[in-house]
Amino acid sequence: VYKRQLIQKHLPNEADKVSTTVSPMVACGRYVKSEYPEAVTVFIGPCIAKKGEARKFSDAIDYVLTFEELACMMAGAEIDPATLASESYINQASGFGISFPLLKGVQGALNHTLEELEETQVQAHYASGLEACLDDMKKLASGKLPCQYFEGMACVNGCIDGPGALAESGLVSVLIKKYASESQHKTVHGDTTAVKAVKKVDMEVR
């Protein structure tokens, strides 16, 4: 949402080139609402921009908490996660989906999807940090940056480095890569729930 606003403000002539697909948060929220109409959806992550996005897409997300806010709530309620019994969880997401918040995470999923579909690879470019994103987008608009697909992340080290994070991004990156490698789905389309959701849910910004 905010990257779209950034382009509309600084490069209005390029605004029509921005993807019209909603974020994973909104897509997931819409899918949950379609399956369970009475569900209350809560997004928990390191990103404070998601709060504004949730207001815009109230059809999908009811509440947003950062990891820091969740930790404060648990501390206030005197809940220590380390003392709670653990439960097994079967991860249904693909390794590529899990890797979305990492540097070039979306680009990796895109490239693998093109390989799966036996399509021609695109010339991609990546930038992180709003200043770097804007600089490179200006180069792209002026024809100085050859690129067919541009992935930009507002936070310097990707989503894992959001202001509401509690752990150092380098450590989080290692843990996410390990978690992704353990996924039973090694291809993008292996995540059958996600494939079903894409076909069922409106993925367009509206």
Please describe what each predicted stretch is.
Residues 3-206:
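Iron-sulfur-associated redox domains of electron-transfer enzymes in respiratory
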